Structure formats: structure tokens, C-alpha cells
């Protein structure tokens, strides 16, 4: 699953390519799973909107939209299936007519969660449409913004008036003391606490393992046994790992690519994640794997206590 660095990389790439562009038309595929908002609401909100900003919030990509309230209320929707370009097969989907009353807010947000295998790509119109494409937004510039997701765990939704808010604290902004206070009284393993998105948003399996290694803490260690000084070290490790990963474009392990379809390189810097049985890069002790709360965790039994 794309984590904070991957989502941040995609958001930054999109911001460079699509901010200021306008969405002329939207095509939706036939699969309902990716749609967290009604299809008609997504189409009526996106079409005609100008993209004013793209940013990350936790593991979500938030695309800020602007349009006049008059335009929002007056635009008449056609059937979603007719949005396919000439030459692309049209998809019929029962009950997914776009005839519902469109949103009249002048500000809205298009929220994308990539799930396990989701990709949000900027493409030229002549780029071949991949099999698992669920949304195509045709832009005024001539480019297209496509959402592709083979496993369909990703989600697309819209929110009015900037109402969307992700739970949890932002790991790149939080200071050491509030970070410590989030976790110190919890009896759960520190790895499980780091993955709790209601506490700290955006950190997933990869970056929790890498951060705990740099902080010298075993993933199964109870948060209540960790000292304030150790939490300060963990805070610094989390921020350093995330920033390094963003610089290298994230970790491409399975399906992840950025907005231009390019892979990241931070997987080449992993010190423990995915390295079970391989020698620790610090002490040469074989890296171990443990299952904690149903998630694989990788650690060095000598460097981490």
C-alpha cells in the first residue's frame, strides 16, 4: 500500500502538472467498489471545475477544486457511459445515471485513496487505457488524469466546502513532545501504535519498520516501556526516514509509480524491511521477521532492543 512518501510524491507531481487546468469531462468505469461518493456526485462535482491545488493529507491525495456556483448549478449531466472517447468501449452501469442535481458549492475537494494498488496518472490522450482504469478526467490542456487500480481497494470521493479532514497527527509536522504523548501511555506494541492512523497518519508497514530500526527499538516493544528520550529518537527517525523516502520518490515494491508512471528508489535504501534472513547492514546479524497484529515486521535482534 502506498504510504506517506509515495502519496506525497504523487501529490507533488500532480501539482506541477495539473494545477490551473480545468476538468472538461469525466468517464467512470462500471465497477462500483472504488466510488465512496455517488457516481453522479463525482461527475457533477469534477466536470467544469478548475484544479486550484493538489496536496497530501495522510494517505489521501486531496485535489482542491474551484468553480462558479452558477456554473455548478446549471450544468446538465449526461449518462456517464457516454464519456468514453471515440474508439474506447463504453461501459453501461445500471443505476449510475449522472442526472442527479449537481453540487452548487463553488469550492470542493476530490479525495483519492490509492488503497493497495491504486495509481493516479497524468497521461496523453493517445496513451493506451489500462484494463483496470476506473476514472478518466479529460483536462482542458488536452491531457488526461486517470485512476487505475487492479485490486479495487482504492477509493474516490468528493467533499464540499473543504469539509474533508483526515484523522491523526501529521508526522512531518508534529513536535517531539506531542509525538511522545501520542504513544507513551499505550500498552500496545510500538509497531501497532505507529500504524494506528487515528494517532499518526500516513505511516505504514515499510516506514514503521525502517524508523524503528534507526531508533533501535524492536517492533514488539510495548509503548509503555519506552522512555521519553527513546521517543525523541524515534520521532527524529520517523521524520528522517520519511523525508529521505520523499527525496527518492518513495518505495516501488509492487505497483507503485508516481504521477508520470516512474518508479521510486527508496526500496534500495531499506535496512530491514523485506530483508528477512539477510545480514543487518550494521552488525551483520540476520534480519528477522515477526507477525504483529497480523502485519509482518522486520527487525535486527541485535541492534533493536
Question: What is the predicted role of each segment?
Answer:
Residues 1-305:
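Structured catalytic/nucleic-acid-binding cores of DNA maintenance enzymes
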